Amino acid sequence: MVKSSVSRMLAGNGLFYPIIGFASFIAFLYLSFGDLWVNYSKEINLSFVERNGTQFYVDGKAFYVNGWNSYWLMDHAADYSTRPRIRTMLQASAKMGLTVCRTWAFNDGGYNALQISPGKFDEKVFRALDHVIAEARRNGIRLILSLVNNLQAYGGKTQYVKWAWEEGVALSSSNDSFFYDPSIRRYFKNYVKTVLTRRNIYTGIEYRDDPTIFAWELINEPRCMTDPSGDTLQDWIEEMSTFVKSIDRKHLLTVGLEGFYGPRSPKKSIANPEVWAADLGSDFIRNSILSTVDFASVHVYPDHWFHHKNFEEMLKFAAKWMLSHIEDGDRELKKPVLFTEFGLSNDNEDFEPAQRDRFLKMVLDVIYKSAKRNRSGAGSFFWQFLVERMERFNDEYGIVPWENPSTYRLITDQSCRLAKVQGLLSTQAEHLKNFCAPRN
């Protein structure tokens, strides 16, 4: 009744439609630029993560990572209907005591592409990445940002080769020409420079100056199978890591390896899952030992690598796999080792929910023991965490952690254990003090 009377009054004065039009305009501005009005002045102060030998440090204290993967953050931030998921994920993770998220800072040539074509960027998607970084900062979460995919998902090296081929400058249509084609290398360097020097519209900080970013990752799971000697990929890593460091010397850098030992490694026959692993063109030691690479990365997917082992055999292998790489970090690399992806598929024929928790606990236990002994195993990252109503983004490894009480307990227990070793970080204190105290 009141609403209709007001409407008649405004209409009688000829003001109804102008006001409605103005309101629509304001709504449009909010949908387009609404985050510019969000108060980002209350972010938690973060310091850069540094490395000294085999350990990470923050403000002079050892820093061990209980982290996770949510590769989809930028993509979902680009659509206002899904943008709230970023805050939900980051807030929930902070409450679990998680400290670092690994996510994609790339999307090449597809839907919600950050890089539409070589050197051409979508400002809307860049603002989405700005939003992700600003939200992470507000919640005291650091980010590992990966710069390109070896796989075809979200463009990857396949898209770079396609662009060069379409422009008539490609040397080869092989996906692996990404690593050696001069034109494609220029494409990628331009992309890297654009991202590293981007000024966040919400915080006013260039990415290369923002301690919210834990590290850059050159490429997710690099393989160059057309050159199993490893020389092609090694040359690319040397060139690109040097290029990144020429622009940004404040942040740490890793390659993004799965951890397989190459044909020249004495461990190729005793630590690799199977013979094929030595012929992928990568080599954990050789690729990671470069002075421009600050820490090593390893993935742990025994059920993906083996097809004829039972769960107990895979669990035993995974533990041995982790310890082998921690040994490498201590003795060969003299650098920290992060297990940046680990998971167990729920599509395995003999899968039982309890198996996943046993596998996760094994990984977390190895990291905790390494931290207690000041060894190089510096942290781990679950693959992957989702929020509700994201079923189509699940790849058989994903979980909504707060919907799985036993898994949730494992995550928070690890946060408490690492906090006991390193001391509570200032960003964790509010969330962890209450529920860690009874456990300690």
Each language-model region and where it sits:
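N-terminal signal-anchor transmembrane helix specifying type II single-pass membrane topology
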Residues: V2-V38
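Active-site mouth of glycoside hydrolases
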Residues: K3-L10, W37-P336, F342-R358, M362-I367, ...
